[in-house]
Structures are given as structure tokens and as C-alpha cells.
């Protein structure tokens, strides 16, 4: 029967007669909520904790011994100077960039801490930190802060391609990647 066809009075009476001893059912269907999907995102609280932990190393009073002549550079004592040479030549391509333009020193420290924590978490070996020229405050402080951090292996003034003397290429010691354990 199509929707356009009307039922006759006789058909309606027959239907009502057949349904006379029945009662209406109440809705008893349980609607199951779909299971929540687990996100691979790091909780905000953990991100803030990592950022604060990583920026804890940055002191304005500590003055590490950096080369005073030539390009800004630093290599940790247990790291080969060849890594510094590869940084200078641009053999490493930064996978992540941080722009500190317009930030205060406190904000810049927090962002550097967050960058280092993110690099370790995401297994990123090389990063570019653009401090800019400006009033030379961040340009002077950024190398001093980076040299204090134990996870920074080396840094060098970036090649022109990545910002020249307004940026630094940083090598970060990443956590060893282990495949997930199978049950």
C-alpha cells in the first residue's frame, strides 16, 4: 500500500477490532553510549609540568663560558666537536622552529623549556630558535640559557637559510625510543 492510498472506514474498523485486546508497549530500549576514544594528546597538566621543569634550568645569574669571538656556538663536553661543525655547515635540518620575537625574558624561558620538552617527547633532534635582533636582550640571553640546560648537546648560529645571526640551531639529546611492549 502506498502513502497516497486512503484506508476505507471498513478497513479501519477491522484493524481496530483486531487490536482491541492489546496494550501499548512502553519504550524499554537502552541506548548505549559509544566508548570514549583515547586520544594520543598529552594532558595539559603534563605539558605545563614539563615546560616548568625544563625552564627550571635557566638562570640569569649563571654565565657559562662561551666563545667570545666569531659565531655564537657551544658544544657540551661529552659531545664531539664534529657535531658543531655539522651544525655550522647546515647538515642538520631543524624539524621544529621557535620564534621568540616580542616575548619577555620570562616568556622566552618558558617557551625554550617547552621546546626542549617537546623535542624530547617527540624525538626531535634538531630545532631552530629565532631570537631576532631587536634590543639584543634575547640575542644575548638565549645562548646563555641554552648552555645551562643538560639536554642541549650543542648549538650554533644558524646558516642564512634558517635565519642567520638572528637564529640558533640547537641539537637536543632525545630520549631513546623503545617500541611499545606487546601483551
Curated annotation (Swiss-Prot):
MF (Gene Ontology): RNA endonuclease activity; rRNA binding
Keyword flag rRNA-binding: yes
EC number(s) given by UniProt: 3.1.-.-
Entry's Gene Ontology BP terms: rescue of stalled ribosome
Keywords on record: Endonuclease, Hydrolase, Nuclease, RNA-binding, rRNA-binding
Annotated ranges, domain Smr: 98-173
InterPro entries from the UniProt entry: Smr_dom, Smr_dom_sf, SmrB-like
Top-level taxon: Bacteria
SMART domains: SMR
Protein family per UniProt: Belongs to the SmrB family.
Subunit details: Associates with collided ribosomes, but not with correctly translating polysomes.
Function according to Swiss-Prot or TrEMBL: Acts as a ribosome collision sensor. Detects stalled/collided disomes (pairs of ribosomes where the leading ribosome is stalled and a second ribosome has collided with it) and endonucleolytically cleaves mRNA at the 5' boundary of the stalled ribosome. Stalled/collided disomes form a new interface (primarily via the 30S subunits) that binds SmrB. Cleaved mRNA becomes available for tmRNA ligation, leading to ribosomal subunit dissociation and rescue of stalled ribosomes.
NCBIfam families attached to this UniProt entry: PRK04946.1
UniProt-recorded name of the protein: Ribosome rescue factor SmrB
Naturally occurring in which organism (per UniProt): Erwinia tasmaniensis (strain DSM 17950 / CFBP 7177 / CIP 109463 / NCPPB 4357 / Et1/99)
Amino acid at each position: 500500500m502506498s502513502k497516497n492510498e486512503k484506508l476505507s472506514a471498513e478497513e479501519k474498523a477491522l484493524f481496530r477490532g483486531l487490536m482491541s485486546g492489546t496494550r501499548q508497549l512502553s519504550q524499554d530500549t537502552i541506548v548505549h553510549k559509544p566508548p570514549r576514544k583515547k586520544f594520543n594528546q598529552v594532558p595539559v597538566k603534563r605539558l605545563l609540568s614539563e615546560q616548568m621543569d625544563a625552564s627550571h634550568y635557566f638562570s640569569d645569574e649563571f654565565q657559562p663560558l662561551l666563545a667570545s669571538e666569531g659565531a655564537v656556538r657551544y658544544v657540551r663536553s661529552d659531545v664531539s666537536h664534529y657535531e658543531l661543525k655539522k651544525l655550522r655547515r647546515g647538515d642538520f635540518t631543524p624539524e621544529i622552529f621557535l620564534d621568540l620575537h616580542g616575548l619577555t625574558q620570562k616568556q622566552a624561558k618558558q617557551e625554550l623549556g617547552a621546546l626542549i620538552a617537546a623535542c624530547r617527547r617527540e624525538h626531535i633532534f634538531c630545532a631552530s630558535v629565532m631570537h631576532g635582533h631587536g634590543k639584543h636582550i634575547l640575542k644575548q640571553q638565549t645562548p646563555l640559557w641554552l648552555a645551562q640546560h643538560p639536554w642541549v648537546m650543542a648549538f650554533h648560529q644558524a646558516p642564512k637559510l634558517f635565519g642567520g645571526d638572528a637564529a640558533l640551531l640547537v641539537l637536543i639529546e632525545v630520549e631513546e625510543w623503545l617500541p611499545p611492549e606487546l601483551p
